[in-house]
Amino acid sequence: MSNYAPFIKPYVEYNEHGWGPCEVPELDVPYQPFCKGDRLGKICDWTVSLPEKKFPSKYASTFGNSSQYAYFYEDDDSTFHLVDTTGSKAFKPYQRGRYRPNVRNNVRARGRTGRGNATLGGLGGPVAGGSTANSTKYGKGRNTRNAQNMGRRFGRNAPTRLRESSVMVQSDWVSIEEIDFPRLLKLALPNIKEGKDIATCGSLEYYDKLYDRVNLRNEKPLLKMDRVVHTVTTTDDPVIRRLSKTMGNVFATDEILATIMCCTRSNYSWDVVIEKLGTKVFLDKRDNDQFDLLTVNETSLEPPMDEEGSINSAHSLAMEATLINHNFSQQVLRIGDQEPRFKFEEPNPFEEQGVDLASMGYRYRQWDLGNEVVLIARCKHNGVVQGPNGDMQFLSIKALNEWDSKVTNSVEWRQKLDTQRGAVLASELRNNACKLARWTVEAVLAGSDQLKLGYVSRVNPRDHLRHVILGTQQFKPQEFATQINLNMDNAWGVLRCLIDIVMKQPDGKYLIMKDPNKSMIRLYDIPENAFDSDGDDESESSEPFGNSIDN
C-alpha cells in the first residue's frame, strides 16, 4: 500500500440555494463586454500595408472599441533607433487584368476554327490563319461593329475626331436660328404634287444597253471622258433669271435642294448661301466651293482620315468619286455623230462654241409648297432610253466606287457583286447613306423614270487612276426612296421650314451651315460682301473634270 500515492478528497462546496460556487473572492477584474457574433482576427498583423478600404471595421467589436486593454509604452528612449535594412515596397493600386495571360497569339482564346481553315475571332475580327473575306463569309458580319472598338472598353476611350467647318464663321456674322436634327425629323409636308415643267433645255444621248450585261466575268475598263460639265449656280443661270421675272418666289438647283432635304443624314459640314430680295429667295452655292464634290464613306463607322498626300484621304477620295461619276455617266451612252440624240425644246443654255458638252438635259420645274410659296428649280437628266412600249424614259446615271474593302471593313465587290448584290448595296447604304439619299431626291425632283447605279472599283487598291466597271443596277426613284427609308414628306417639310424662317427676315444675305461636329444646322445673317473675294474666277465652274482634277 505504501507504493501508491494517497488519495485526498477535494473540497466541494455545496450550494443549497442555487447553482455555482457559494463564495467568490473579489479580485477587481474588469469586465469586457463581448458578442459571440464577433469575428476572430489577429491581434496584430504586421504584413498588411494598408487597411481595407471597402470594409475598414471588418473585425471591430459590435459594442465599440475600448481602450482599456490598449498598451501604452511610458518609458521614452530617444536614443534607441530601429534600422530597417529591407527595402520597402511601394503600394500599387489594383490593376484590372494585371495577371491576365497574353492572348494576342492564343488562337484558343481568340476564337474557333471554321470551315475552310478560316479562323473566326472571338472578339469579332480575324486572327492569324484566317482572312477577312472568310471571316465575313462565315461570321456573316455579325461582329464588325465590335471589331471597330477592339482594345477599347465599350468605345469610351475612342478618340474624338473634330471635323473642319466648310466655311469660317466671321465675327460680324449674326446667328439667327439653330435647329437640331431631332426637330427636323418631326417635320412633314404631305401631298406635294409632281413638279410641272415650265422649260426644257439641252439634249440627251441614248443609253447603251450592253452595259447591263457587265458582270465580274465581263468587266469593262472605265475610260476618261473629256467632256465639259457645267456646274452653274442659281443666280448665274440665264433661264432662272428669265423665269424669276414672271413666276415663282423661291429659286434653286436640284443639288442645293437635295442637300437641304437630306441634311439629317449628313455628317460633313456644308453651306448654302441665301439671298432675299423682296418676296423672292435665291438659294445659291459659293464660288470655288467643294459643294459639287461627292463624299465617300461619309456615314460609315470609320470615315476616311484627312491625311495630306494620301490617295485615301477624304479630299482625294471625293475628287476620285466625282471623276468616276462623270466618266461613268458619259461612257455608258451611245456616243457618236451618227448616233441619235433626244433634243428638248430649247438648246443648252450653257453651250459654248467649240466645246464638247456632256450629255445633259435640263428641266426647269415648278412646285407649289403652299402658303404662297412657289418653288422653281433646275433639274437634270443624264441619258434617255426607249421603253418597251416605245415611250422615252429619262435616266439619272450615278456611280458607286470601291477603293479598299479591307480598310473600310465592307463587302468585297469582286466576290459578292454577282451572287449577293443586295449585301453590296446594303453595305453602301450604311457607308454612303447621305450620298445615295441625295441622288434619290435629285432623281425624284427631275422626274426621272430610272435611277441607274454603276459599280466601279479600282484595278488595284493602291492605284487610284485606273478603274473597272463591275456591274450596273437600276431602280425606280420612288421605289428606291422607300427601300432606303427616305421620307419625301419629311424632306419637303425641312425645306419649307427653312424657307419660312428666311421669309420672315429682312432683305439681305444669309447662310445655312451644317455644324461640323453637331447634328444641327445654323442660320446666319452675313454681310452683302461676305464672299465677293471668292468669285473672281467664275470660269472654273464650267471646266471639264478631266482638266480640273489631277488624274
Curated annotation (Swiss-Prot):
- Residues covered by region (RNA gate): 290-304
Extent of Gly residues compositional bias: 119-128
A GO term, aspect molecular function? mRNA cap binding
Keyword Protein biosynthesis in record: yes
GO process annotations (BP): cap-dependent translational initiation; formation of cytoplasmic translation initiation complex; regulation of translational initiation
Q: Name one GO cellular component term.
A: eukaryotic translation initiation factor 3 complex
**Biased composition range(s): Acidic residues:** 531-541
Key words, A-Z: Cytoplasm, Initiation factor, Protein biosynthesis, RNA-binding
Q: Give the primary localization class.
A: cytoplasm
Q: Which domain of life is it from?
A: Eukaryota
Q: One Pfam annotation, family name?
A: eIF-3_zeta
Compartments reported by the entry: Cytoplasm
**Segments for region (Disordered):** 108-152, 530-551
Extract the PANTHER family matched here.
EUKARYOTIC TRANSLATION INITIATION FACTOR 3 SUBUNIT 7, EUKARYOTIC TRANSLATION INITIATION FACTOR 3 SUBUNIT D
State the oligomer form and interacting partners: Component of the eukaryotic translation initiation factor 3 (eIF-3) complex. The eIF-3 complex interacts with pix.
Q: What is known of its domains?
A: The RNA gate region regulates mRNA cap recognition to prevent promiscuous mRNA-binding before assembly of eif3d into the full eukaryotic translation initiation factor 3 (eIF-3) complex.
What is the role of the protein in this entry? Answer: mRNA cap-binding component of the eukaryotic translation initiation factor 3 (eIF-3) complex, which is involved in protein synthesis of a specialized repertoire of mRNAs and, together with other initiation factors, stimulates binding of mRNA and methionyl-tRNAi to the 40S ribosome. The eIF-3 complex specifically targets and initiates translation of a subset of mRNAs involved in cell proliferation. In the eIF-3 complex, eif3d specifically recognizes and binds the 7-methylguanosine cap of a subset of mRNAs.
Family affiliation: Belongs to the eIF-3 subunit D family.
| UniProt protein name | Eukaryotic translation initiation factor 3 subunit D-2
Q: Which organism is it from?
A: Drosophila yakuba (Fruit fly)
Q: Recall the taxonomic lineage recorded for the source organism.
A: Eukaryota, Metazoa, Ecdysozoa, Arthropoda, Hexapoda
